[in-house]
Amino acid sequence: MKLLVFGANSQLGQELIRLLTDTEIEFSALDTDQLDVLKPKEVVKAVTRINPTQLINVSTYSNLQKAETDPQAAKRCDQINTDGVTALARVCKQLNIPIIHHSSSYVFDGQKKETYDEEDEANPVCSYGKSKWYGERTLREESEKHIILRTDWLFSAYRNKYFLNLIDSCKKNAGKISVVDNRFSPTHAGDAARVILGIVKQVDCNAEVWGTYHYNAMQAVNQDQFVLHVLEEAAKLDAELDKILPSLEIELLPVERPYIRNSALNASKIMGTFGIKQHSRGPGVTAVLEEIYGVKKEKPPVQGNSAAIASDNESQARPKTKTKRKKVSAKKPRQSMPPAKKAAKQK
């Protein structure tokens, strides 16, 4: 088995490379600044030279707000998320190489109350979501041997601005912060990389498992619940934040484009097909915060160590932070969402 990871500098790409480095799997990694996917001849040349048995595309443009308001950003979003996927799909078809492609829950409109299934109808409402959906659509048309893995919002130590901004805002505003009132299932990029690696191994065994799959961490949450979780964990490492947390007040903002109300996915199909189980996001949150605060990981305590057990019990007994939740109505009517160019059911 030999893999080509395209999108090496994305957070998912970084986590995938980290995992692959600890295996005996041969792989090469490229990013968009090393290979211009808008030049088909260069793509064919690069893929032919590397000669992989599978291509994993985790390249993405994911700045939702910028893609919605900046024409140049929107163009770049389309180039990477749609045109780039088309180019890679054509090369993979030409060279008979299976392609595993990372996509997003933002191909949906967020109006469903339950988690989204693979068979649910796509109806993206923002530029980013449309670019991901059009990329999926062309991949299905161009390459039969494909797997599309949709995930919800990813986080990692490699891209930790959300965590940093959240902590900084909480400190600067004496515990008063604002978040969008949406429901999602934040997933550590390392967990998503684990899933891709599990898929790769079964594809290498010639498993006929082509199609679309969903994965995200266990238990969808409202964003204010996730914020509280992050801040409570951060407070264990930050004395200043720990003092502020008892007065935490979270203001809930209305969901407006480019965001969607619900982006959580049902991951039962991937379990049934590949035997891949959902993991909790908790360890991932802890890992990111330890990276931010420069915590060095120590060896786990030996069983029977009474001091370690007492310390752990004290941590578990830490009282839950009580928050004030304030829902804010939109100041102006929400803009109507233009329909996607085409909606279809997935297989």
Predicted regions and their residues:
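NAD(P)-dependent short-chain dehydrogenase/reductase
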Residues: R137-F184, A189-G198
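Active-site loop of classical SDR/Rossmann-like NAD(P)-dependent oxidoreductases
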Residues: L35, Q223, S247-A267, S280
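Mid/C-terminal beta-alpha module of Rossmann-like enzyme folds, strongest
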Residues: V195-I196, Q202-V255, K296-G304, A308-I309
